[in-house]
């Protein structure tokens, strides 16, 4: 299964047509002009924008008795800053990104934050245009993730990641991401057994653009079918808004860095703010 996933990822990442090598290329100038106009339209979008989903949700354990120790608020903010237009080699562009996730114990005395996870990085992306259509995006990125804690609560690792997105239709996107880990945290040497080596999933919008459904499976280290599962279902508040009422389900390990070895099955409800286009994962 791992081999099939890697083959699929490679196809997505390198599936850019190479002219004049066993292909019949017709009206190449016109096709190039169309591709340039697509990139120009994408480059005209704001340099600063949302990256991954931003959300604020609260909930409790699924399949157990809720109490103040297993009920919490979880929120995430995520944004990116594009540094260039897509005029670097291979029509790629450079960008910075930052994601911060928090687990907040709002039912305990003094409302303490249980864990804060910081995920900055830099990426190089290329839009994939085939047959005069935008069909995907390929990205290589360097990212860091840590929780800013000291002593035995400290968690930290780095990743060189390869990611691909395939835009199957205007309302359906499949995504995959594989990372080469560099684990530098003293107290999370075995993090791959819980937080995984690669992930795959999809994002789908209803035809009326009111509903959005995400599903991501994160494969943990090992040959067993051991996945962390994240499912999100959102309903758009109004037609012209990027705000949704969301139900989020998490099942598995690695939901936060501090508790990466702990199994969680949580259901949460709240507000989702997502990009106008498909989200990044």
Where are these regions (language model features)?
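Cleavable N-terminal export/targeting peptides
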Residues: 1-39, 279-281
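Short glycine/proline- and aromatic-enriched beta-strand/turn motifs that initiate or cap beta-hairpins
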Residues: 24-85, 122, 274-276
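Intrinsically disordered, low-complexity linker/tail regions enriched in polar/charged residues
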Residues: 24-25, 146, 182-184, 214-216, ...
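Predominantly the C-terminal beta-signal and adjacent terminal strand-loop region
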Residues: 27, 38-44, 228-281
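Outer-membrane pore/translocation modules
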Residues: 51, 56-58, 85-207, 215-217, ...
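Conserved aromatic-histidine-acidic binding/catalytic patches
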Residues: 64-67, 71, 110, 152, ...
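Membrane-embedded beta-strand positions in outer-membrane beta-barrel channels/transporters
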Residues: 72, 76-78, 119-121, 161, ...
């Amino acid at each position: 299964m791992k081999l099939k996933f890697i083959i699929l990822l490679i196809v997505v990442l390198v599936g850019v047509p190479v002219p004049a090598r066993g292909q019949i290329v017709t009206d190449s100038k016109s096709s190039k002009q169309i591709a340039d106009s697509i990139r120009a339209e994408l480059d005209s979008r704001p340099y600063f924008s949302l990256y991954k989903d931003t959300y604020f949700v609260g909930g409790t354990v699924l399949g157990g008795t809720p109490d103040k120790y297993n009920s919490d608020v979880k929120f995430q903010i995520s944004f990116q800053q594009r540094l260039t237009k897509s005029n670097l080699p291979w029509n790629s562009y450079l960008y910075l990104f930052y994601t911060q996730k928090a687990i907040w114990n709002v039912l305990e005395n003094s409302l303490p934050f249980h864990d804060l996870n910081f995920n900055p990085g830099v990426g190089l992306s290329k839009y994939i245009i085939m047959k005069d259509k935008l069909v995907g995006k390929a990205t290589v990125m360097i990212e860091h993730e840590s929780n800013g804690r000291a002593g035995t609560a400290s968690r930290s690792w780095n990743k060189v990641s390869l990611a691909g997105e395939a835009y199957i239709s205007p309302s359906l996107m499949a995504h995959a991401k594989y990372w080469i880990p560099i684990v530098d945290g003293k107290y999370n040497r075995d993090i791959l057994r819980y937080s995984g080596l690669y992930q795959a999933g999809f994002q789908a919008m209803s035809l009326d653009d009111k509903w959005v459904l995400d599903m991501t499976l994160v494969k943990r280290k090992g040959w067993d079918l051991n996945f962390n599962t994240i499912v999100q279902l959102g309903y758009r508040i109004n037609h012209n808004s990027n705000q949704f009422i969301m139900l989020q389900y998490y099942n598995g390990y690695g939901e936060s860095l501090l508790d990466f070895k702990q199994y969680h099955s949580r259901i949460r409800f709240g507000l989702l703010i997502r990009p106008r286009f498909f989200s990044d994962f």
